[in-house]
Structures are given as C-alpha cells and as structure tokens.
A protein has these predicted regions:
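Short alpha-helix boundary/capping and kink motifs at helix termini
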Residues: 1-112
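A short, basic-hydrophobic beta/loop patch
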Residues: 97-159
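Sequence-level detector for tyrosine residue identity
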Residues: 16, 21, 40, 68, ...
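Generic hydrophobic, helix-prone segments enriched in Leu/Val/Ile
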Residues: 48-49, 66-81, 129, 140-145, ...
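C-terminal interaction module
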Residues: 164-255
C-alpha cells in the first residue's frame, strides 16, 4: 500500500494537494469554540485546509508532502477494504486497519474543514482519490463537529475575504494568540489571552492592543506588545477567510 500511495502522490494532479495547509490547532484561533453538534456532510477536498502535524510530518507543508511520509503499516493485509473505505460514506465507520479504532473526524469553521482525527488516512485518501479517475474527490458523509466563526473576528475576516485587508496570526499556545490586520498603511494588533479553565464564548474574543500607521510604528508596537517579530506571524490566505464565512457544509449536513 505504501508504494500505491507514493505512486498516487507522484501522479495525482490537483491544486489542493500542493497548497500549504494550516495546523488544526492554529485554525481553532478563528473558532467560537461553541459546538453546533456532530454532522455528516459531504466535504469537498477543496474545503479541507488543515491537518495536525505529527513528529514524522514535522517538515511537511502540503498534503502531497505528507502522503510521501506515510508508513501505511498493516494496510497491505486489508488493501481491498482500505481502498473501498476511501470512496465510501464514512460516518462512524472505523478505518479497517488494526489499531485504528475511531472514525475519521473533522472539525469545521463555516465551510473550512480541518482534520481532528485521522491525520494518516486522510492524506492517503486525498492523493489516491485525486489519482483514481473513478474515485470522488470528496469526504462522503464524514463525521464533523461544526463551529461558528469567532465573533470578534467576523468583521476582520469579512475585510480580508473581500481583498480589503491582510490578516496575520501568531499562536503562542492555547491561551495566548495574536492577530495583525493590515489595511493599506494602517495596522491593528489584537490579542486573546485567557486563563486556564475559561471556556465561555467571550473568553476567546480578541481585543485591540494598539494600532497605527506605517511600518516604523508597527515595529515599535511589536517590540512592546508581541512576543515575536512580524516575520514569525503567518498570513491567512484570502481563500480560507472566505471559507470561514460560508455555511454550505451545515446546510448540506445530516445530524
């Protein structure tokens, strides 16, 4: 199976395989952390924007990179079942390999989905289905926990989705995060810092730290308020900001 997945990764042609993905824990920055429950939507591969990196994936940037690193241990013995799983309704079905006891589980903010459980099988599914002409490029009826957009970031994401601003983020840890919004010459720095145990929606809100104009004032602000320089922040692609604001996955989903 490892050779089959590597061959698929070599030959598959799909733009989403070569887009840099975002770490799932970083995408959670943009969530309201208020679960709307578990649903079973059909999620197009195009809508999957994040994985959680394991140690063996630490140098990987894209889905294709990650597929090459898979060990596929125990997959050969269940090859027929594994390939059938890739193109079947997933729901609460376990991956048919010894040691994999839980269903593939996604989280979604709006229409932007990211992997919560199944970070090995998902890249394999992506490259194999993209390579195989008779397989669909969609996660069929996949278990998915749905969240809304962090209300304090809604207006910011709307600006970015329209191309009227650029958003950068820095994830210190689960309790300390930063957002930088640039609109022309103006910049605004936001921070969310909460204490252990806080879990209300408002506890995840971002609050303005400072704002100004021109790069020189931004550098001063970063020295005073940010733990790292701007070069350590990551930019959120406009495409993902648009997905955050969508709602088609929820409309298409069955509880």
């Amino acid at each position: 199976m490892k050779k089959i997945i590597e061959q698929a990764a070599d030959r598959a042609v799909a733009e989403y395989l070569d887009r840099p993905y975002i770490l799932s824990r970083e995408l959670a920055i943009f969530s309201d952390h208020q679960s709307k429950g578990d649903f079973y939507p059909n999620i197009p591969f195009e809508n999957v924007v994040g994985l959680e990196k394991r140690n063996e994936f630490k140098d990987c940037v894209t889905i294709r990179d990650t597929a090459y690193r898979l060990h596929c241990e125990g997959w050969d013995e269940r090859k027929t079942e594994v390939l059938a799983y890739f193109n079947s309704p997933l729901r609460d079905n376990e991956f048919p390999v010894t040691g994999s006891r839980k269903p593939l589980t996604m989280h979604a903010i709006g229409d932007a989905a990211y992997c919560f459980l199944g970070n090995h099988r998902l890249p394999a599914m992506f490259v194999y289905n993209a390579y195989s002409s008779n397989f669909d490029e969609v996660l069929k009826e996949v278990k998915c926990t749905k969240y809304g957009v962090n209300e304090s970031l809604f207006e910011i994401l709307t600006l970015v989705s329209k191309g009227e601003g650029r958003l950068y983020y820095y994830h210190v840890d689960s309790y300390d995060k930063f957002i930088l919004l640039e609109t022309g010459l103006r910049w605004t720095l936001y921070r969310n810092k909460r204490s252990l145990g806080q879990s209300d929606k408002e506890d995840f809100y971002f609050h303005k730290v400072c704002s100004g104009f021109f790069e020189w004032s931004q550098k001063i602000a970063f020295c005073l308020f940010s733990p790292v320089p701007k070069s350590s922040y990551k930019e959120l692609p406009q495409r993902i900001s648009r997905l955050f604001l969508g709602d088609s996955l929820l409309n298409d989903a069955e509880e």
